[in-house]
Amino acid sequence: MDQADHSGVPDDAALEEAPNTVPIQEKSAQPHDTQPYCAFTKRSKLFIVLTVSLAGFFSPFAINIYIPALPQIAGMLHTSEAATNVTVTVYMIAQGLSPVIWAPLSDVFGRRPIYILTFFIFFIANLGLSFTNVYWLLVVLRMVQAAGACSAIAIGAGTIGDVTERKERGSYMGYYALAQYTGPAIGPVVGGALSQRWDYHATFFFLTAISGPFLLFMLLFLVETLRVIVGNGSAKTSGIYRPLVEPKLQRSIANAPRPGIKNPLHGTLDFGFHRPFLVFARPETSLAILAFSMVYASYYLSSGSLPYLFKQVYGLDELLIGVCFVPSGVGCAVGTVLAGKILDWDYRRALDKSKLGVKVTRARLQSAWIYLPCYCASLLAYGWCVRAHTHIAAPIVFQFTLGMFSTMYFTNVNTLIVDLYPGKAASATAAVNVGRCLLGAVAVAVVQPMIDAMGAGWTFTLGALLTLIVGLICQVLIYLYGEMWAARKHS
């Protein structure tokens, strides 16, 4: 479904797949435009972005609240450390694959209905996990839990693509990622405290207690943003698309209903489940996803092994293990805000320098040349600090830098993907989820056997070198040929 036929809005949202070079006319508003690109005010955009950001918070929070209790679960369910890691692995597999279904559906039926459906699934899964004492059922319900929570990340990126233009998108992507990367900071602390005071079931009771009210909040306040349904946001909605308490978010100049907005239930439907996989057919996006996924997988080498390493090397209990995740999460929060501001600055600088147009792939990856080596150096240093049994402050510092530089890199790549697929940003972000979560699942599954065989130092050295080599190769190819590939696809 091509939104160019229905939204009536010029600019990049009118393209299902955007060219790599953005015309120089973006420097100034078009005087003949009678409708703004987005009818939502700046404050309203921030409200929408913060709402979907909170939705994206639950997925990483749900996985990280659980990690400090892994040694406890192994003891209570009489399983091995490798077996308990499987419950993390299946979560990440479902985290990667479920958006392939939900994101295309949100590109057809709208963001709001899919948000509500998936969070209801998440709530029910949390309730079931709260009473689970059987290993196989724990594995199954963890997959259901992930399938409900993880769609919010891809749909959230699509929502931001609905309401923002390229020149402002970097900052909003930073705000969007803020809550998403706060989950790794507070999740382990909450999980460690709950599992130490009671047991691992308490973490799922807690998730049930917070996901229920947020589901109600979305029913009350979340607005529809999909442009083929509401245009630039000024079209009136009804039924499932209308929040129970409808806030006044639009500019006064755009309050009138927009003609020509199609009901997605009318006509022939293309659910587009294949659409995320088509993203891999474009070389520039497949290379960006590969680089992103390598960083993500190597990051989970450190976070997935932290509970066992810090318990073995430093003798920490569940609560203190959870506290050790805080620096990484704080680094993630700092990184996402910084990356958003730097992205907008990079884009404006490229726009000012260009006489023909902005080369999007180069503009969005300018700072990535710095982030990637800094991240890999942090991973290398972290591994050898743990191997040498240094004071715990040293690996904690590198946990902070790992979180910061990885998040800055993720924000750059995510923004590039949204720019290249403005009409189908949710589906494109689902493709990113497939790559990152599948490689991350592999990392979680192999990290403990690797540490047992090679030691922490060489395990993280190998991870850092592979990430650096693959990432740099991908970036060089995108820098040299990205514009040509995107132009060829667009033509």
Swiss-Prot record:
Q: Which residues form a coiled coil?
A: none
Xref: PROSITE patterns: MFS (PS50850)
Would the keyword Cell membrane turn up in this protein's UniProt record?
yes
- Indicate the transmembrane segments per the record: 47-67, 86-106, 119-139, 143-163, 174-194, 203-223, 287-307, 319-339, 366-386, 390-410, 438-458, 460-480
> Which GO molecular function entries does the Swiss-Prot or TrEMBL record give?
transmembrane transporter activity
Return the GO cellular component terms, semicolon-separated.
plasma membrane
Explain what the UniProt record notes about the effect of disrupting the gene for this protein.
Answer: Decreases the production of itaconic acid.
Carbohydrate-modified residues are: 85, 232
Q: Which UniProt keywords apply?
A: Cell membrane, Glycoprotein, Membrane, Transmembrane, Transmembrane helix, Transport
Q: Where do the record's region annotations for Disordered lie?
A: 1-30
Q: Which Pfam families match?
A: MFS_1 (PF07690)
Membrane topology term:
Multi-pass membrane protein
Q: Localized where?
A: Cell membrane
* PANTHER family linked: MAJOR FACILITATOR SUPERFAMILY, QUINIDINE RESISTANCE PROTEIN 1-RELATED
- Recorded family membership: Belongs to the major facilitator superfamily.
Q: What does this protein do?
A: MFS transporter; part of the gene cluster that mediates the biosynthesis of itaconic acid and 2-hydroxyparaconate. Cis-aconitate is secreted by the mitochondrial tricarboxylate transporter MTT1. In the cytosol cis-aconitate is converted into trans-aconitate via isomerization by the aconitate-delta-isomerase ADI1. Decarboxylation of trans-aconitate by the trans-aconitate decarboxylase TAD1 then leads then to the production of itaconic acid.
Q: What is this protein called?
A: Itaconate transport protein
